[in-house]
């Protein structure tokens, strides 16, 4: 469970409320609806979010910028100890976008500042060819401060998010309980390719394993 400093007691109170509520809500769609209803209050709390980002700049212990994340612009704000949900902050430079990727859980995205663009895709192939994926763009949405959007797990949630404008934008995301998969798929729609993206620690272990295999070390 993420420990927040006393100076962010207001944020801790939000997460405590979310935890108590989600423990009582069993259905995925109901949890998504609850999260979408709750998020604007946090997204529009500029004073609190400025405090969080100021603490990042000052090198405070929270948020812990040393914590391993899938993307370099990702900051972990909270992970529930029962994995009911996690909360993450993303900061996008002008023109910066994530790779096209899927997710291992449902999620709700929200815009904190400027504009966030979310591009959704549908997978068109039958998934029988390793490394091959044919995608079709299904829609684009533009989020402004306080707006939210939903992403669903696996093929139902293939998307990319980013900053279409000048100036740095900030996005807040809440993710539900993940399925037991150690990677996410990342896609290259122009080349019809798909590959697995692993968390940094696991990615390093896999690289070391591959190196040992190349060196003839088989029994690990």
Q: Which residue ranges define each predicted feature?
A:
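Glycine- and acidic-residue-biased ligand/ion/polar-headgroup-sensing regions
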Residues: 105-124
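A short glycine-rich, His/Asp/Glu-containing loop-to-beta-strand
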Residues: 68-94
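Asparagine-centered strand-capping/turn motif at beta-strand->loop junctions
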Residues: 160-165
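Short acidic-glycine-tyrosine-enriched beta hairpin
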Residues: 122-158, 197-201
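Conserved short histidine dyad/triad with adjacent acidic residue
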Residues: 88-102, 152-156
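Long hydrophobic alpha-helical segments typical of transmembrane helices together
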Residues: 187-220
